[in-house]
Amino acid sequence: SDDEDSLGEVGKVGVPIDSLEDMETLFADINLGEVSTSMTINAPATTLLALYVATADNQGIPREKLRGTVQNDILKEYIARGLYVYPPKESIRLTTDLFEWCNINTPKWNTISVSGYHIREAGSTAVEEVALTLANGIFYAEEAVKAGLDIDDFAPRMSFFFGCHNDFFEEIAKFRAARELWYELVNERFNPKNPKSSQLRFHTQTAGVTLTAQQPINNAVRVSYQALS
C-alpha cells in the first residue's frame, strides 16, 4: 500500500493490509472466535484469508470456530469491476483450492460471495444480473467438482450478493426467481444429498448507481424504498 499507484486508494476503499503484523493490529483485542468477519476481497482472497487464519492461530483460536466470508469472486472482476491480478485459469484454481482448504480447516467459513451487485452497477438489467451471477456460480461449482470435490463439500458455504434497485416488484421477483433457479440448477446438474447445497443464501445492498450527490434527501427515500423489496 506504499506503492505510488496505491496513494489514491489507501484509506478510501478499505483497510490496507500488507503483512501479518497489519492483520494482527487490525484485530487487536478482538477475539476472532466470537465474531464473524466479512472481507470484500477477490484476487488476493487466499492471501488475506491466510493472514486472518494466522492471526487466529496466534490468538489460540481453533480454526473450526472461525466464521466469516471472503468474496473470492474473480469472474465478476473480469465481467464488471476490473480488479483481477492473475489470468482466468489460475484465478479459478485459487478459488477452488480455497473451497477445498476451508472445507477441511474452517468449515464454518463462507468461501465465496458470488456477486451480481457489481454487474448491475456496471449497467446490466435485473435479468442480466441474475443470469450472469448464477452462471458464474454454476461455473465455480463445475470447476470445484472437476478438481475432485463433492458438491456437498462446498455448496452449503457458497453465498451470493445482489443489488436492489427502484423497481419494487421487479426486485422482489428477481430475488424469488434467483432462489428457484439456483435450486433447480444445482439439483439437476450435481444431485446433492445435502438440501443446503441448493439453497441460495444471499446478501443485498441498495443501489449506488441510483443515487446522486445533488439529491441527498431523495437518496434517503430511494434506498428506503429499495430496502423494502
Predicted regions and their residues:
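Non-catalytic terminal/interface segments that mediate subunit docking, oligomerization
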Residues: S1, N218-S229
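Catalytic alpha/beta active-site cores
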Residues: S1-E171, R189-P192, K196-Q205
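Charged, alpha-helix-enriched surfaces in structured cytosolic catalytic cores
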Residues: T47, A177, N219-R222
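Short, well-ordered amphipathic alpha-helical segments that serve as non-catalytic structural scaffolds
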Residues: Y140-A141, L181, L185
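Extended amphipathic alpha-helical segments enriched in small hydrophobics
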Residues: E171-R179
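Flexible, glycine/threonine-enriched loop-and-boundary segments that flank and lead into catalytic domains
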Residues: Y183, A207-R222
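Alpha-helix capping/termination and helix-coil
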Residues: V186-F190, L228
